[in-house]
């Protein structure tokens, strides 16, 4: 057998070639798992004294989507627990909780979530599983209705103690990108809320299953959607809870693993059959793809021949500081809860936008100009609107709801709390 077809570590038969090196199955599994172990190096079995094992001092919460990447992270963390139990007579350095946000009401899966979780429980006996419906974000929440104008101004047209629903929320969102953006905001909210709940009994770290390619996709999609200020919070690791916007440690154990390597790992570990896709598939027509789908397609097409691109994007993102670190008087965005300076987003948007058209040169342009002027006059904010509360929105959320005339969103607060957050 030639050197070119043998594993670089043990000279066994090559199962995969990646990063300009050959690996057999066992060596590749070890290679990938070592990256996860390094990120979770604090999850070791602790001893009070020789022979006296302490209970787990940390809880690892893994958000799962039933996709390949989060499934791989779950398998790696579970394998670490199995090794600890075998080595230290059933001792464990951490507890493992997998949390799934059920978005099937908005985007159905090929299998029922309960059926999938039942299969995962059989495969990963040392992990606990929690399924949270997306609708929980609306439970016990007031609903705020925003009137949104084409000049990007928004006003609170109604506040109700009655909660809205997933379908009501999504029905007023016109574009696929905006729908995915709002759903991701709700998913993250529910995951962090569950992590904070578990943190009350045991210090909890959120271990996201994003691989390097997915983090690169997330970096660019956040930038395109006007959420560049979220890159520091969602792409970077925050092992110190003081550095995290959620107040909890957040890590990315797979941030040095490429997405095309994940299916090989799952196949070698015999867990590929546990991955489940959504019923809806991405369109074959580029213009019908959402921003997230476009970014995914872009990196999937280039990473095999240019694997360094994704890691370069992630390393560049890691150099970004928190844009709000030195700012005072920030309040949370009504929709995504990002810290934002009241009215700054709209002011910045107005300043960078060309608000007046060029002078018409032909009769046709003159007619179109008059028509546009009439439409703009009809859409101008009336005196009644000017007396309505102004919601505190970040630039990204203003862009997300720009094509929506009326938007109803859940708000976990009383009417007075909501009014106190608005500028009158």
Curated annotation (Swiss-Prot):
GO CC list: cytosol
Record-linked Gene3D superfamilies: HUPs
Pathway: tRNA modification; 5-methoxycarbonylmethyl-2-thiouridine-tRNA biosynthesis
Keywords: Cytoplasm, tRNA processing
Keyword Metal-binding: no
Family per record: Belongs to the CTU2/NCS2 family.
General function of this protein: Plays a central role in 2-thiolation of mcm(5)S(2)U at tRNA wobble positions of tRNA(Lys), tRNA(Glu) and tRNA(Gln). May act by forming a heterodimer with NCS6 that ligates sulfur from thiocarboxylated URM1 onto the uridine of tRNAs at wobble position. Prior mcm(5) tRNA modification by the elongator complex is required for 2-thiolation. May also be involved in protein urmylation.
Stretches with biased composition (Basic and acidic residues): 368-385
Domain of life: Eukaryota
GO-annotated biological processes: protein urmylation; tRNA thio-modification; tRNA wobble position uridine thiolation; tRNA wobble uridine modification
GO terms assigned for molecular function: nucleotidyltransferase activity; sulfurtransferase activity; tRNA binding
Region (Disordered): 357-385
Protein localization: Cytoplasm
Protein name: Cytoplasmic tRNA 2-thiolation protein 2
């Amino acid at each position: 057998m030639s050197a070119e077809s043998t594993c670089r570590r043990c000279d066994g038969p090559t199962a995969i070639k990646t990063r300009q090196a050959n690996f057999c199955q066992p060596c590749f599994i070890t290679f990938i798992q070592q990256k996860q172990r390094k990120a979770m190096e604090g999850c070791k079995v602790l001893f009070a004294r020789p022979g006296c094992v302490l209970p787990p001092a940390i809880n690892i919460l893994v958000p799962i989507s039933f996709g390949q990447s989060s499934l791989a992270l779950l398998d790696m963390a579970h394998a670490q627990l199995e090794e600890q139990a075998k080595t230290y007579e059933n001792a464990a350095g951490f507890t493992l909780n997998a949390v799934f946000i059920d978005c099937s009401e908005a985007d159905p899966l090929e299998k029922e979530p309960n059926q999938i979780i039942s299969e995962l429980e059989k495969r990963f006996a040392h992990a606990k599983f929690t399924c949270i419906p997306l609708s929980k974000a609306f439970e016990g929440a007031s609903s705020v209705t925003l009137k949104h104008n084409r000049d990007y101004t928004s006003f609170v047209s109604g506040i109700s103690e009655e909660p809205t629903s997933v379908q009501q929320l999504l029905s007023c969102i016109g574009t696929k990108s905006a729908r995915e953006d709002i759903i991701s905001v709700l998913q993250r909210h529910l995951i962090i809320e569950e992590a904070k709940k578990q943190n009350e009994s045991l210090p909890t770290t959120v271990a996201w299953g994003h691989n390097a390619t997915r983090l690169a996709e997330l970096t660019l999609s956040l930038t395109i959607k006007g959420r560049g200020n979220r890159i520091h919070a969602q792409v970077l690791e925050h092992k110190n809870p003081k550095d995290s916007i959620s107040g909890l440690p957040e890590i990315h154990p797979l941030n040095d693993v490429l997405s095309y390597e994940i299916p090989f790992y799952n196949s070698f570990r015999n867990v590929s059959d546990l991955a489940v896709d959504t019923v809806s598939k991405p369109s074959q027509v580029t213009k019908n793809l959402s921003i997230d789908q476009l970014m995914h397609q872009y990196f999937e097409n280039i990473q095999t021949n240019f694997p360094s691109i994704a890691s370069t994007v992630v390393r560049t993102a890691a150099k970004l500081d928190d844009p709000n670190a030195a700012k005072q008087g920030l309040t949370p965005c009504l929709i995504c809860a990002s810290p934002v300076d009241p009215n700054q987003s709209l002011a910045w948007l107005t300043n960078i936008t060309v608000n007046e058209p060029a002078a018409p040169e032909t009769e046709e342009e003159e007619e179109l100009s008059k028509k546009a002027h009439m439409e703009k006059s009809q859409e101008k904010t009336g005196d009644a609107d000017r007396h309505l509360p102004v919601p505190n929105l970040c630039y990204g959320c203003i862009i997300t709801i720009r094509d929506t005339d009326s938007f109803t969103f859940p708000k976990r607060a009383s009417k007075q709390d909501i009014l106190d957050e608005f500028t009158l």
